[in-house]
């Protein structure tokens, strides 16, 4: 393929981002990668098909990119990702402007499909389902140079009643430890300091290939890689957290004292309808244990409101939990009715207006909690990774803050500070979600 201009639009989660980065690497040698789709002759849209709003965004983006065939330079429109895997037949009929359609297990066919279409105009439509394949290899990072996501497993075995991911991504399958370590070593050589481990469920890592959960061992091995400063864990199911994992987080200085626990709900009756393999008591006990064992740990969660049949009593129970437990970070999502899931067939679907009201109530409550938590940080000194400049101030994150979903720490410019540096900042003021501080050194004590 001649050096044709290619642009990739990546939608959805961090796991999708990794797939996009893998595709970019495959294309890089034979194509010129451009950021602006209006300049590209080949446009790739990596879609998300998880919830209704994500599907709408994906379809709107595909249609917008398709319009560039008439208004700009686009000759080939490639669509891939979870939406194509989930709605392969429907999409082909709905959007005839697509020239190539690939499922989540077909990225190895990307380059050849583009070549074939450019040569002959022959369209390609692949959507292989796989319970064994794992997309891995070299990537071109789309994150800042100092941070990178590393996927440690693919798929999911949980089959929650509201979620279509197992039907899209297949069963849970861990990557080999040596492959992950090789990837981390390569990333560290490129200057990456923060490694963010992701999967549909990171806490189950190793169960399928090693016969036991070995996330704690993986953390220990990654921490030995030269250049790695922070290791961050996302998507940790509370019921799968082991004592070994707690000990490793507690004692390993490179592992951020931060855990993302996607609990979704707290009422036992709702958890049961969701198909979650846990209980209110288990969730509360693990939160207490984490706080007792790991000093300064930050806990984040995501909640779903408006699940089918959610009563005022069940919602009040959720509000009471949020108020009493006071998690450091919290996101709320309205339940989305997904085709092919058993929850979509449940009776007593909740009105959208009620979902929105409940979402707002939780977020107002959490905003107050977050404001109080942040006030307690005034006077404290944190290591901060510098991310950029906004309105004449630097901003960055400490160990309590995951990229894009949590707050930031702002501080005045310092001529000795560069983006990507890890420096010390003393907190002087607090907001609901963000902190303000000064660079901490001998003179600012």
Swiss-Prot record:
List of residues binding [4Fe-4S] cluster 2: 156, 160, 163
Family annotation (Pfam families): Radical_SAM (PF04055), TRAM_2 (PF18693), UPF0004 (PF00919)
Similarity remark: Belongs to the methylthiotransferase family. RimO subfamily.
Lineage: Bacteria, Bacillati, Bacillota, Clostridia, Eubacteriales
Cofactor note: Binds 2 [4Fe-4S] clusters. One cluster is coordinated with 3 cysteines and an exchangeable S-adenosyl-L-methionine.
Domain Radical SAM core: 142-372
Residues binding [4Fe-4S] cluster 1, per UniProt: 13, 48, 82
Domain TRAM: 375-441
EC number from the UniProt entry: 2.8.4.4
Reactions catalysed according to its record: L-aspartate(89)-[ribosomal protein uS12]-hydrogen + (sulfur carrier)-SH + AH2 + 2 S-adenosyl-L-methionine = 3-methylsulfanyl-L-aspartate(89)-[ribosomal protein uS12]-hydrogen + (sulfur carrier)-H + 5'-deoxyadenosine + L-methionine + A + S-adenosyl-L-homocysteine + 2 H(+)
GO molecular function, one term: 4 iron, 4 sulfur cluster binding
Domain of life from the UniProt record: Bacteria
Stored PROSITE patterns: MTTASE_N (PS51449), MTTASE_RADICAL (PS01278), RADICAL_SAM (PS51918), TRAM (PS50926)
Residues of the MTTase N-terminal domain: 4-119
InterPro entries in UniProt: Elp3/MiaA/NifB-like_rSAM, Methylthiotransferase, Methylthiotransferase_CS, Methylthiotransferase_N, Methylthiotransferase_N_sf, NA-bd_OB-fold, Ribosomal_uS12_MeSTrfase_RimO, rSAM
GO annotation, biological process: tRNA modification
GO CC terms in record: cytosol
Function: Catalyzes the methylthiolation of an aspartic acid residue of ribosomal protein uS12.
Cofactor: [4Fe-4S] cluster
NCBIfam families, A to Z: 30S ribosomal protein S12 methylthiotransferase RimO, MiaB/RimO family radical SAM methylthiotransferase
Cell location: Cytoplasm
Protein name: Ribosomal protein uS12 methylthiotransferase RimO
Gene3D superfamilies for the chain: Methylthiotransferase, N-terminal domain (3.40.50.12160), Nucleic acid-binding proteins (2.40.50.140), tm_1862 like domain (3.80.30.20)
Keyword terms, alphabetized: 4Fe-4S, Cytoplasm, Iron, Iron-sulfur, Metal-binding, S-adenosyl-L-methionine, Transferase
């Amino acid at each position: 393929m001649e050096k044709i201009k290619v642009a990739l639009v990546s939608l959805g989660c961090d796991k999708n981002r990794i797939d996009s980065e893998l595709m970019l690497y495959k294309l890089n040698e034979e194509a010129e990668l451009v950021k602006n789709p209006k300049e590209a002759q080949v446009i790739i849209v990596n879609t998300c098909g998880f919830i209704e709003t994500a599907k709408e965004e994906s379809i709107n983006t595909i249609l917008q990119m398709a319009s560039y065939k008439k208004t700009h330079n686009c000759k080939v429109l490639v669509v891939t990702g979870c939406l194509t895997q989930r709605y392969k037949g429907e999409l082909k009929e709905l959007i005839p402007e697509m020239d190539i359609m690939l499922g989540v297990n077909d990225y190895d066919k990307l380059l050849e499909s583009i070549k074939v279409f450019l040569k002959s105009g022959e369209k390609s439509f692949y959507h292989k389902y796989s319970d064994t394949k794992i997309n891995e290899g070299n990537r071109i990072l789309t994150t800042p140079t100092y941070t990178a996501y590393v996927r440690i497993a693919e798929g999911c075995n949980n089959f929650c009643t509201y979620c279509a991911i197992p039907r899209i991504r297949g069963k849970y399958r861990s990557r080999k430890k040596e492959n992950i370590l090789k990837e981390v070593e390569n990333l560290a050589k490129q200057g990456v300091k923060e490694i963010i481990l992701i999967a549909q469920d990171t806490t189950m890592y190793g169960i399928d290939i090693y016969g036991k959960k070995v996330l704690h061992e993986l953390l220990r091995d990654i921490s030995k890689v030269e250049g790695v400063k922070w290791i961050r864990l996302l998507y940790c199911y509370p019921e799968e957290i082991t004592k070994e994992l707690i000990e490793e987080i507690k004692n390993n200085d490179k592992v951020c004292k931060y855990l993302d626990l996607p609990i979704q709900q707290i009422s036992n009756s709702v958890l049961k309808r969701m198909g979650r393999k846990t209980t209110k008591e288990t969730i509360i006990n693990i939160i207490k244990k984490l706080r007792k064992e790991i000093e300064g740990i930050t806990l984040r969660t995501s909640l779903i409101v408006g699940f089918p049949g959610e009563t005022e009593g069940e919602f009040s129970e959720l509000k009471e939990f949020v108020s009493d437990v006071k998690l450091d970070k919290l996101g709320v999502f309205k339940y989305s009715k997904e085709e092919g899931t058993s929850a979509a067939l449940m009776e007593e679907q909740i009105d959208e207006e009620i979902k929105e009201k409940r979402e707002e109530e939780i977020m107002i409550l959490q905003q107050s909690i977050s404001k109080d938590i942040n006030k307690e940080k005034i006077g404290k000194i944190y290591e901060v990774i510098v991310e950029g400049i906004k309105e004449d101030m630097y901003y960055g994150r400490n160990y309590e803050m995951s990229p894009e979903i949590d707050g930031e720490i702002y501080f005045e410019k310092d001529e000795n500070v560069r983006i990507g540096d890890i420096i010390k900042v003393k907190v002087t003021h607090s907001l609901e979600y963000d902190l303000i501080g000064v660079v901490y050194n001998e003179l600012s004590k």
